[in-house]
């Protein structure tokens, strides 16, 4: 039974909705970040990170590019591996047993690496050797994927330049390394600004590097809306680097141009959604919910949710990622994720009186 206080709150909310509908300007088309798959589009237990298959999956899921890590073997062959040891991502090739003792990449020749170890996967077909830089870049070229090299090896950047011209990304914290790359390439140079919160100082460093450039950081508090706006207006890229949920949503709202992510997706015009669900001009009282669960499990899927609203809401995607979003005035947010063997769903719960002028959810089958 509704109390007079509840009825009054509902009436005020409906009046606000009616006023909003009478003076709503034409909706602008939002611009979302370029999506880069961190260590490729890996899938836990199935598709290994930093693998050729992770490049193919990045193409399948609609990512623009992949980030990869480059290191030398003992005999100076460049291969793709993030850790100093093989233990987290590899098994013994002979019997697929776990590596109980630390196995350092720097202690192995390339022949030993290829002969004795494979990447971990539940699918025997994906238990492949750790790829060379050339093998991974060849896969990027085959599938039309932009490579982002996280590497301290100048030789790796020369290989990328030979294979891609200027259409690749150099991702490193060293100004001197970026300046070296600039002697032979006008690739996109992404610099780690460190703890310096000054956008002006970042611009000064980037101008010294020259050419196409930007910043990349894992520091969530650095990428404020003014910081992002200042760099973007100066013509530079701003990358949010592996921000966990829900911080990647704030980075998107603040205006980053690139998201380097382990899970995030944005609406993708390259693909026709399998299903689209929409609603307009919905008023919610505190604890009111909007819930949608599809009926079919999808092997390789994506779910995005676009929202124009005023108020505070809690959003859950696939009962996996949870966001608390607040817009004091009518504003836009977009969140999304990739998934494997899952039934897509979302839930929106109002935390205070909220008006959702527009909701669009897209489900993709990749």
Regions found by a protein language model. Give the residues of each.
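Exposed low-complexity, polar/acidic, P/S/T/G-rich flexible segments that act as propeptides
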Residues: 352-366
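Extracellular carbohydrate recognition and processing domains
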Residues: 320-342
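Short, surface-exposed beta-strand/strand-loop-strand elements in extracellular ectodomains
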Residues: 311-321
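Bacterial N-terminal signal peptides
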Residues: 12-20
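Phosphate-group recognition and catalysis centered on beta-loop-alpha active-site segments
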Residues: 23-284, 345-350
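A short beta-strand element within beta-rich, extracytoplasmic domains
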Residues: 299-311, 344-350
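Bacterial N-terminal signal peptides that target proteins for export
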Residues: 2-11
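Short beta-strands within extracellular/lumenal beta-sheet-rich domains
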Residues: 283-298, 332-336
């Amino acid at each position: 039974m509704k109390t007079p206080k509840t009825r009054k709150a509902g009436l005020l909310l409906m009046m606000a909705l009616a006023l909003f509908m009478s003076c709503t300007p034409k909706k602008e088309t939002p611009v979302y970040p370029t999506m880069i798959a961190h260590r490729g589009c890996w899938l836990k237990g199935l598709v290994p990170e930093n693998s050729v298959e992770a490049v193919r999956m990045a193409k399948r899921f609609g990512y623009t590019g992949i980030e990869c890590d480059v290191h030398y073997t003992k005999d100076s062959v460049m291969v793709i591996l993030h850790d100093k040891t093989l233990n987290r991502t590899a098994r013994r090739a002979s019997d697929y047993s776990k590596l109980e003792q630390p196995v350092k990449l720097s202690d192995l020749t390339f022949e030993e690496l290829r002969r004795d170890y494979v990447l971990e996967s539940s699918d025997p077909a994906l238990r492949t050797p750790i790829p060379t830089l050339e093998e991974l870049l060849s896969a990027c070229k085959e599938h039309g994927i932009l490579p982002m090299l996280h590497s301290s090896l100048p030789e790796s950047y020369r290989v990328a330049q030979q294979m891609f011209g200027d259409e690749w990304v150099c991702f490193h914290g060293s100004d001197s390394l970026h300046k070296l790359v600039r002697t032979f390439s006008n690739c996109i140079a992404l610099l780690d600004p460190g703890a310096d919160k000054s956008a002006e100082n970042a611009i000064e460093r980037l101008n010294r590097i020259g050419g196409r450039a930007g910043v990349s950081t894992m520091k969530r508090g650095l990428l404020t809306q003014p910081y992002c706006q200042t760099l973007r207006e100066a013509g530079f890229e701003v990358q949010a680097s592996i921000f966990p949920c829900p911080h990647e949503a704030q980075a998107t709202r603040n205006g980053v141009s690139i998201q380097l992510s382990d899970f995030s997706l944005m609406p993708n015009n390259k693909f026709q959604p399998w299903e689209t669900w929409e609603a307009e001009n919905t008023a919610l009282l505190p604890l009111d919910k909007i819930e949608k669960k599809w009926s079919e499990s999808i092997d390789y899927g994506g779910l995005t949710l676009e929202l124009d609203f005023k108020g505070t809401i809690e959003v859950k995607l696939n009962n996996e990622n949870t966001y608390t979003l607040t817009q004091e005035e009518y504003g836009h947010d977009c969140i999304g994720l990739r998934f494997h063997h899952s039934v897509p769903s979302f839930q929106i719960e109002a935390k205070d009186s909220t008006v959702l002028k527009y909701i669009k959810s897209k489900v993709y089958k990749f």
